[in-house]
């Protein structure tokens, strides 16, 4: 997420974990503004606009077919991209201002892709003159896929100076007033507003015109965040005219046969609330006065209260974790209606004007993307039962706790992507910033920063997840070069870009068989490739301020028939190494002579 606009996630202050708003303001000033912009590029803080009663002009009609739950939303086949992703193996994260020269680290490292090289923020990036479009040309000439992008919901007052235009796009609370996020000095745009979606689409079209390979969208589902003093993320946002009109259509689509008496008995909806489901599918429910309903029942200050029977129909959002099949309005429409419209329109623009396919991705796990790009931050719900995963584990004395495996978390990301999208698309991850994960990473000694990547890049790849190596952000944090990481990143890139190596991490299938090793603290996963080779991935978690090399490790894993050969592949070896093996009882048995950080044992039938 660009600079500091990712600070708040539901229920958690995300400035370096749990910093206060005062510290946030100081951090913004110290770092020269948001998204790396200098303070001269940003307008002075603006107070909330004068009281007004209209926010986010609604669409003229319900979605095609009348709307409703996910089974009722029409999905245009054109929303899916067709560009090849099979050569995207090495991801490097470098984000900078749009007008700067190319990041020399990117060109020196030469990853397959930079998934968010630019991210439009406020008015920086709304005009072609804001961009150095030579940068994507340089990247592409070096074989690097260049992804630009924008915040999807952070809205500054100066983006729409005219009050009428601002009111047509801004998200509101249950009293009908725009929600001012005072810590960040912005509002949220309403994705339900066709005018706001067109604004985002126009920015994407401009970047496509500049020759980028694709677009990254940040905070796609944050229009429902909410903000009141002392309780950021209370969910009191998104109750604007556009969302409410769609909510009425959603209710009528979901329950088309309810009588007025049933609406009243189940939800307390009366004739005064103007929910008219007898109209044609295109317009049914769109006159629903949900804010009036909330006011009449005393729920304006807490619209998601359990006392409100419609709160369960409205739903709640965990940023970057949409649930389009959960049967709620926000779960369904944010992903399947609003996000689909943006992705489809931009894909068709590139197809019709330039005869090309573009990549589209977003921060989190979303449908309709070419690949997922998941930000890693603290307080996430990524673990079992919604528990938080620590993506940069520390020991009590502040060192890297390399004994901790992230393999299960990476596997869960891939599984979630398949569930939400319905297809198997590549899954990438990056250390989001500024977050406690980034803070913990930056606090590591230089050698342990290096070890972090040596351990967790291959552990992610073992799950067929692509972990971005961090080059630069717009916070003024130390770059990879300043941290002494460029030699490692260049060597790692060269190793995994080698076609015979890259092939081990695409079109894989996780196998249920168990990999056994003669030593403890070895992370392992067994995969099968499309050519039927079997790969046993071994990650060494014997670690204490450095890898504890394991020699002579006995390893066994199941394969259907005796292999023709077994080869060891590792960035810690000088070259791929043929290995003697035995086969009996459906098990391949080998002895790995040296396991430093990672070894792939490749069995070829």
Annotate the PLM regions:
Residues 131-184, 214-224:
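Glycine-rich, aromatic-flanked loop segments that form ligand/cofactor-binding clefts
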Residues 584-605:
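C-terminal beta-strand-rich structural cap/linker in extracellular carbohydrate-active enzymes
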Residues 22, 26-57, 61:
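Bacterial Sec-dependent N-terminal signal peptides
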Residues 344-470:
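Catalytic-core region of carbohydrate-active enzymes that cleave or remodel glycosidic bonds
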Residues 181-371, 375-380, 395-399, 403:
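Polysaccharide-binding and catalytic clefts of secreted carbohydrate-active enzymes
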Residues 53-106:
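Boundary/entry segment of secreted carbohydrate-active catalytic domains
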Residues 90-127, 206, 210-212:
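Catalytic domains of carbohydrate-active enzymes, especially glycoside hydrolases
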Residues 458-459, 515-562, 599:
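Carbohydrate-binding surface patches
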């Amino acid at each position: 997420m660009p600079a500091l606009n990712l600070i708040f996630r539901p229920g958690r202050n995300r400035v370096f974990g749990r910093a206060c708003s005062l510290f946030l303001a100081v951090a913004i000033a110290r770092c020269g503004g948001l998204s790396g912009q200098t303070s001269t590029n940003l307008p002075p803080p603006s107070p909330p606009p004068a009281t007004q009663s209209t926010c986010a002009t609604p669409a003229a009609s319900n979605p095609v077919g009348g709307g409703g739950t996910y089974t009722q939303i029409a999905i245009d086949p054109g929303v899916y991209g067709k560009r090849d992703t099979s050569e995207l193996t090495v991801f490097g994260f470098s984000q900078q201002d749009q007008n700067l020269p190319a990041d020399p680290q990117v060109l020196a490292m030469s990853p397959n892709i930079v998934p968010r090289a630019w991210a439009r923020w406020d008015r920086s990036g709304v005009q072609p003159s804001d961009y150095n479009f030579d940068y994507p040309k340089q990247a592409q000439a070096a074989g690097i896929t260049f992804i630009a992008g924008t915040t999807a919901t952070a809205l500054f007052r100066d983006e729409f100076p005219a009050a009428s235009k601002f009111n047509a796009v801004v998200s509101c609370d249950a009293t009908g007033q725009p929600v001012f996020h005072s810590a960040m000095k912005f509002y949220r745009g309403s994705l339900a507003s066709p005018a706001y979606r067109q604004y985002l689409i126009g920015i994407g079209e401009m970047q496509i015109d500049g020759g980028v390979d694709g677009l990254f969208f940040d905070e796609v589902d944050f229009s429902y965040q909410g903000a009141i003093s002392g309780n950021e993320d209370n969910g009191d946002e998104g109750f604007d005219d556009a969302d409410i009109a769609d909510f009425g259509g959603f209710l009528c689509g979901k329950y088309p046969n309810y009588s007025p008496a049933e609406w009243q008995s189940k939800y307390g909806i009366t004739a005064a609330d103007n929910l008219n489901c007898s109209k044609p599918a295109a317009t049914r429910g769109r006159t629903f006065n949900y804010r009036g309903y909330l006011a009449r029942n005393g729920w304006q200050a807490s619209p998601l209260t359990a006392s409100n029977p419609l709160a369960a129909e409205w739903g709640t959002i965990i940023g970057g974790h949409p649930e389009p099949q959960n049967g709620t309005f926000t779960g369904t429409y944010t992903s399947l209606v609003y996000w689909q419209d943006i992705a489809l329109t931009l894909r068709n623009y590139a197809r019709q004007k330039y005869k090309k396919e573009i990549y589209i991705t977003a921060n989190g796990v979303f449908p309709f993307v070419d690949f997922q790009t998941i930000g890693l931050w603290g307080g996430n719900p990524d673990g079992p039962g919604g528990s938080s995963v620590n993506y940069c584990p520390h020991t009590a004395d502040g060192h890297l706790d390399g004994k901790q495996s992230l393999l299960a978390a990476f596997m869960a990301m891939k599984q979630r992507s398949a569930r939400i999208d319905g297809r198997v698309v590549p899954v990438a991850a990056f250390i989001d910033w500024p977050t406690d994960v980034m803070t913990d990473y930056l606090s590591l000694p230089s050698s342990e920063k290096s070890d972090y990547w040596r351990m967790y890049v291959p552990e992610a790849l073992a799950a067929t997840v692509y972990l971005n190596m961090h080059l630069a952000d717009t916070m003024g944090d130390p770059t990879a070069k300043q941290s002494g990481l460029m030699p490692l990143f260049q060597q790692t890139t060269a190793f995994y870009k080698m076609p015979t190596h890259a092939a081990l991490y695409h079109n894989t299938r996780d196998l249920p068989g168990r990999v056994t090793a003669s030593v403890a603290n070895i992370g392992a996963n067994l995969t099968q490739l499309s050519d039927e080779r079997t790969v046993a991935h071994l990650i060494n978690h014997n670690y204490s301020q450095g890898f504890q090399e394991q020699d002579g490790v006995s390893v066994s894993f199941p394969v259907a028939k005796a292999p023709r050969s077994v080869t060891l592949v590792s960035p810690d070896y000088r070259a791929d190494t043929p290995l003697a093996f035995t086969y009996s009882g459906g098990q391949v048995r080998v002895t790995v002579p040296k396991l430093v950080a990672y070894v792939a044992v490749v069995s070829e039938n």
